[in-house]
Swiss-Prot record:
Gene3D superfamilies: Cysteine proteinases. Disulfide bonds join C126-C224, C136-C180, C170-C213, C272-C320. Residues 17-114 form a propeptide. Residues 1-16 form the signal peptide. Its main location: other. PANTHER family: CYSTEINE PROTEASE FAMILY C1-RELATED. It comes from Homo sapiens. Thiol protease. Key protease responsible for the removal of the invariant chain from MHC class II molecules and MHC class II antigen presentation. The bond-specificity of this proteinase is in part similar to the specificities of cathepsin L. This is Cathepsin S. It holds the Pfam family Peptidase_C1. Monomer.
Length: 331
């Protein structure tokens, strides 16, 4: 993955110098200062500048269309603004759906049960602060611990950040996971079941890199007895589970620039597919100006979207695959 980034930098450096728009110099420096961007070499900065300008143009045109009522969300030049969508996917979105996928659908739906029009588990104190996974494809681990954190809060009354690094380091080949090179939420749950626990984030902090497994049972903060999978593509069942059980781990198609540059509103990308590549956590749902949405917690830091969250279109034909592989753990 990192080799791909290096090749991009080398091949593009000369071209970058030719295409730089000097009228954007001041804004480039402001953006770098805002997000603490520093580059090791001039060639790297030249390439990043070119990518940044391309993304800036994309954001400006999209937001112009948004102002004319053509989109239900707007974009912003966040901390990922100097990256291509290919880089974001390579470094930060590495969901590995098992190739021989055999789902064990155990969720029992009750279609006659009346559900609330909106749910936000943050309001019930069941969601920890937004994390930043950095240049490590650990989205699956953050999605998994987020779902278990909510179950821990519901059972014990205590909200504890659990260790994503524990999963990155220890839930590995046996479970089909590859640390920073990707994994899947249900296999992470299975590791916690087999291991009889997971450490707290405080005792086993996140390092954004693969390490030797350092799990210590004396720092165990939560256990998992089983996990439940929901039927493929059923947004009605996903709504029921989110309302009645708690936050649900899901995968989405996040490969579009409109996703990683999302700022606010209800995200709807016509090019989105149901081929999921990024693990996130559905923590609620609702309606914004007539647009139904899923409230989704990401792991790209507070500078992404709405303080680290994105509202994704709901009841739009399983948009971006959000209801393709939902699951949640139980204690």
């Amino acid at each position: 993955m990192k080799r791909l980034v290096c090749v991009l930098l080398v091949c593009s450096s000369a071209v970058a110098q030719l295409h730089k728009d000097p009228t954007l110099d001041h804004h480039w420096h402001l953006w770098k200062k805002t997000y603490g961007k520093q580059y090791k070499e001039k060639n790297e900065e030249a390439v990043r500048r070119l990518i940044w300008e391309k993304n800036l143009k994309f954001v400006m045109l999209h937001n112009l269309e948004h102002s004319m009522g053509m989109h239900s969300y707007d974009l912003g030049m966040n901390h990922l603004g100097d990256m291509t969508s290919e880089e974001v996917m390579s470094l930060m979105s590495s969901l590995r759906v098992p190739s021989q996928w055999q789902r064990n659908i155990t969720y029992k739906s009750n279609p006659n049960r009346i559900l609330p029009d909106s749910v936000d588990w943050r309001e019930k104190g069941c969601v920890t602060e937004v994390k930043y996974q950095g240049s490590c494809g650990a989205c699956w681990a953050f999605s998994a611990v987020g779902a278990l954190e909510a179950q821990l809060k519901l059972k014990t009354g205590k909200l504890v950040s659990l260790s994503a690094q524990n999963l990155v380091d220890c839930s590995t080949e046996k479970y089909g996971n590859k640390g920073c090179n990707g994994g899947f939420m249900t296999t992470a749950f299975q590791y916690i079941i087999d291991n009889k626990g997971i450490d707290s984030d405080a005792s086993y902090p996140y390092k954004a890199m693969d390490q030797k497994c350092q799990y210590d049972s004396k720092y165990r903060a939560a256990t998992c007895s089983k996990y439940t999978e929901l039927p493929y593509g059923r947004e009605d069942v996903l709504k029921e589970a989110v309302a009645n059980k708690g936050p649900v781990s899901v995968g989405v198609d996040a490969r579009h620039p409109s996703f990683f540059l999302y700022r606010s509103g209800v995200y709807y990308e016509p090019s989105c597919t149901q081929n999921v590549n990024h693990g996130v956590l559905v923590v609620g749902y609702g309606d914004l100006n007539g647009k139904e949405y899923w409230l989704v917690k990401n792991s790209w830091g507070h500078n992404f979207g709405e303080e680290g969250y994105i509202r994704m279109a709901r009841n739009k034909g399983n948009h971006c695959g959000i209801a393709s592989f939902p699951s949640y753990p139980e204690i």
